[in-house]
Amino acid sequence: MNKWSRFKFTPNLPLGANGERVTGSKAHIELSKEAAKEGMVLLKNENNVLPLAAGSKVALFGKGTFDYVKGGGGSGDVTVAYIRNLYEGLKLQKEKISIFEELCDYYRNDIKKQYAAGAVPGMTIEPDVPAELLSKAQAYTDTAIISICRYSGEGWDRKSVIDPNNKALWEYEREMTEKSAELFKDGDFCLSVKEKEMIDTVKASFKNVIVILNVGGMVDTSWFAYDDQIQSALLALQGGIEGGLAAAELLVGDGNPSGKTVDTFAKSLDDYPSTYNFHESRNYVDYTEDIYVGYRYFETIPGAAEKVVYPFGYGLSYTTFDVETVSAGVVNSNCTSEANKLYAKVSVTNTGKFSGKEVVQVYIAKPQGKLGKPAKELVAFEKTRELQPGESQLMILTWEINDMASYDDLGKVKKSAYVLEAGSYDIYVGTSVRDVTKADYSYILNHDVITEQLSAKLVPTSLPKRMLADGSYEALPQSEPVDTDYSAIGNIDPSLTEGVAPCQRAIPYFRFADGMAKNGSHDIMDVVEGRITLDEFVSELSIDELIHLLGGQPNTGVANTFGIGNMPEYGIPSVMTADGPAGVRIAPEVGICTTAFPCSTLLACTWNPDVLEAVGRAGGEELKENNLALWLTPAICIHRSPLCGRNFEYYSEDPFVTGKLAGAMVRGIQSNNVGATLKHFALNNKETNRKNSDSRVSERAAREIYLKAFEMIVKNDNPWAIMSSYNMINGYRASESEDLLTGILRDEWGYEGMVTTDWWTCGEHYKETKAGNDLKMGNGYPDRVKKAYDKGAISRSEMETSVKRILGLILKLD
């Protein structure tokens, strides 16, 4: 096949053996199910109620039995051939268990009626179960399974109070916010009134009660964790196309739960330090908890530990494991030539009766010093293979010494530097942040060490204070605000960036046919075949041609998120992008069904990079088979608050887990010679007013928490593209931030790939290009860029730099 022939309007040629398509194939759907099983977390299992014994009879309660949520909404949605809910999954276990069908008929019919009336999956009302039906269920069995489901999506956050000023990008987003508030008077973190009534009835009526959480993120778990009338609970999250079957197989013992939490589950929403100001303003969010996010807060701040129901890294199994630290220390020449690392050698033995997997986690307790530190921070983890009863595995986990450094943004030790402060760096090994044992070895420093000297970037101007390790706050320097929306060519017309879905507005800026006069004498194939360099090719392009390449291009083929390139007179193909952190997203009207994989949070709960790489490889195959070039995933913002509507797209509250696992996803995707896109860069931790909300954060928290996963993946996994975020960061639009997109991303981290905006940002196109944002999506504003060029506000050199990065991505494709 000739170069780029997939992108030149050829049929979607199958990639599978014997001419079979891999998109939505049995193999990919099976992979989706197995990934979901590996990530689901057993939170509670008193009296070994699970797995269900052969011959068990069960009654299924809760609308979630049929109102199954495969994943979140917006760009994370996936068009699929079917969705297998919990009931359908359990029906396939008919040789092991039986189900009280009359109750299921009642729920099925009720949910069908609600869907017919316009209800969205996950947004239905919990129906009342008739007393007669309840009595029949009691007579049938003493075991009940309760399903609780939750749904959220792009463009709206989880909350219970209607914001009358919420100007959503699409009307659908406002509608969903209002519907959520109607269903959940106290917010959907908590149970609804109807859910509470149903649960109380079930507890009073059945001996054994099992809870399934089909949710996209953190919810209240205290209602079952401390209740002796509820014996078992499985955090099933949103499992994709076969999520119901994955949960069902675990319930009957066809597989052993090995997932671990990637977030801290607190007793109350108010226990999270981010809650009090999450909805304080539409215009800004103050990250006053600073680096104390998730377990870093709950394990450090006095009085916070008692607020935890299930800690970070927690998860039960049907078997038991013994985890022993054999030794720990500095990696030396006896093991490897690398002496800048520490290691922990750990033995894991399956001491129970079921085969299973365990996750070994290594945490560091740093000296508090002048900077203050979290009580523990994750530095390494590894999952065992499937261990049979009595079987052991010896593991050696290593990590960089310099990765234990902390960033000093105020000059308490050395300003704008990563510092290893003097003192003892203690090593803790175990199976959660709480279930750990201190190793015999500690890394001792007798003096401070500067590991990396940088310069100040993303300095806050309006963040009033930040939290310290003792729970108090320190005041931060303030500065005069600047007009960051100033434009040398006049303010941008708001109609370009606001209102209804902007596809129609984009049409005047798209090029649908040939007609541009060719300025240069060469073709892009001259670059491919080595006759000229890319620099030489780009130098021949006219200003208009350069500007054309700086913007998105119209959809072709099955795409619905627009493309890149599109200069046929130069042989430059129009290559397409695709949404979907949980699978390749193709619009339903196209008629192509892809594989819906588990949501990113569930994938993260596997703690298994091999699983993420396999999912990425499969998704990359589906992308390529459908003649798509750039997958707009993984999304790796941090779970700062349970309220973020897009948490299901993101991985964890911890940047190290996020970076390791999303990095594996990138490797898998790009093994197909198609591109992965890290997003949203950066600090897009809130959807409400996402195009204008200002994330006000300290430089230390930005670097140690919110940028760290991006840094890890850029340095280790070479993503082809990065998507800048809608929001502002300390008063500057992320898409226009030279500090972020050039100073940190390129100068410090050495990134050489392409940066794209999110779709229809409020940023000024020429300012985005100058800052290091190479591509404006879903379309550029060529007239404004040309006007800026004519006024001297942007140079040809700056445009050429971005065009070379865009063409560099296209040249990587086969």
Language model features with spans:
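Glycoside hydrolase catalytic-domain context in secreted enzymes
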Residues: 1-435, 456-814
